[in-house]
A protein has these predicted regions:
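Short phosphate-binding loop-to-helix
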Residues: 47, 53-112
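Conserved core of the sugar-phosphate nucleotidyltransferase
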Residues: 102-192
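Conserved alpha/beta core of the MobA/IspD/sugar-nucleotide pyrophosphorylase nucleotidyltransferase superfamily
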Residues: 165-243
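N-terminal glycine-rich phosphate-binding loop and ensuing alpha1 helix
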Residues: 2-49
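Short, high-confidence coil segments that cap the C-terminus of an alpha-helix
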Residues: 43, 89, 118-120, 210
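A conserved hydrophobic position in a structured secondary element of the catalytic/binding core
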Residues: 50-51, 102, 178, 225
Length: 281
């Protein structure tokens, strides 16, 4: 089975322009995400899908693979679906480009959650036991889950409301795994009323009758959406004393290590009217 991890990366972020290339622990942030993704056991291939040649070039120089997608993609799922047209696979994993502290174990878990049954078409992860402060933060998305593991609802509000005084909040982590046909059909869905109210794309799928299966994450992750978030991530890297993770087969600046083979130049495909492949050198 071919399982491809795709990291959507947009340069023109409203809250943080140029976010994927922002320096973090001595390297562009997108390379930390790429390294974490490549540490996952169950991904057979990892690539960055971006509408910006600068991001593609940084990824290429590190030994990674980048796909140039259209600037019109409205969401990460749309960018993923666009990439899937050109890169066949059985399963696609949407890896958030703003998650430099993403755990490889969580990536494997979302794939395992999807593959637990051939009837499952979409899977994601949640973290149990978050406190009320996080639950009341509208930037932290919560999910209510049925006994069989299906998502009942996602919200920026604190759900479910602890009327009995015993909180049971679960934080949604923005990792998704999709079967190929499901991804194609999801991308064709129009925006839905609940999606517009909460500004949560996954509500579009629930409203259309899709089941989203939720696995239990092994650890939390910090999303970087603003320069302030980046500063927090930098503090975590410094406190852990981590050396920047390298893309497999490369050295600190994307160069090959002495004992590893030199990676071939990454192919950057422009997804548009032509089917030609470009190799950026």
């Amino acid at each position: 089975m071919k399982v491809i991890g795709v990291i959507p990366a947009r340069y023109a972020s409203v809250r943080f322009p140029g976010k994927p290339l922002a320096p973090l622990s001595g390297r562009p942030m997108i390379l930390h995400v790429l390294a974490a993704a490549r540490a996952a056991r169950l991904l057979t291939r990892v690539m960055v899908a971006t509408d910006d040649a600068r991001i593609a070039e940084v990824v290429r120089e590190s030994g990674g693979e980048a796909l140039l997608t259209s600037a019109e993609a409205a969401s990460g799922t749309d960018r993923l679906a666009e990439a899937a047209v050109r890169v066949p696979a059985d399963v696609y994993v949407n890896l958030q480009g703003g998650e430099p502290l993403m755990a490889a174990e969580n990536v494997d878990l979302v794939v395992e959650t999807l593959l637990a049954s051939p009837a499952r078409e979409i899977a994601t992860l949640a973290l149990s036991g978050i406190g009320e402060t996080a639950a009341r933060d509208p930037n932290v998305v919560k999910v209510a889950v049925a006994a069989d593991g299906r998502a009942l609802y996602f919200s920026r509000a604190a759900i479910p409301f602890p009327r009995s005084g015993v909180p049971a909040f679960r934080k949604h982590l923005g990792l998704y795994a999709y079967r190929a046909d499901a991804l194609r059909r999801l991308a064709a869905l129009p925006p839905s009323p609940l999606e517009k109210i909460e500004s949560l794309e996954q509500l579009r799928w629930l409203e259309a009758g899709w089941s989203i299966w939720v696995g239990e994450a092994v650890s939390d992750s910090i999303g970087v959406d603003t320069p302030e978030d980046l500063a927090k991530a930098e503090e975590i890297f410094e406190s852990r004393g981590d050396r920047p993770k390298q893309v497999a087969g490369t050295g600190p600046e994307g160069a090959c290590t002495r004992n590893s083979p030199r990676p071939a130049p990454a192919t950057v495909q422009r997804l548009g009217k032509t089917a030609e492949k470009e190799v950026i050198r």
